[in-house]
């Protein structure tokens, strides 16, 4: 799972666009699929017509999120059964024996989703999905503007963390869960990510279709 935290305009949506563009260029829809819940800038609908894209859900279609979670539950249950039949314990081993697309579920501004009635109803289930899905080739990407938008129990499920243009080094420390002694320059797309327990400076790139 990937957690991206940054102030408004720091490049969170740009990160998602670049990641999805890169993945869809490298992998077919048999290898990689994604679902988007866009409660931010509504710029991610550009991916709607790609064969890799299962759905783009926004505020006016938020009720569809319930159907999405039902689908994801079915996928995980089917993969549990398949893994047992293949006698494997994780997605990497199973994918060597059978074509199984890696699935990424993207929440751009997860706090916006959680403020909806549908989001409030599904919050506890979302915790379950984060904990149980990654072993079966289903991962999540959350973007948040502040560390307090999701609780610590939820944050602990995210092993990959990226911080973009936060207010001070203490916020970087909180979100990355590693001690940060410096702040990156205030440049578009500049941030810090946690790598093997160390904070490393990074630079995002914008894709050009």
Role assignments for model-derived ranges:
Residues 1-89, 95-176, 182-185, 196:
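P-loop NTPase catalytic phosphate-binding loop
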Residues 183-209:
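Conserved AAA+ ATPase small/helical "lid" subdomain
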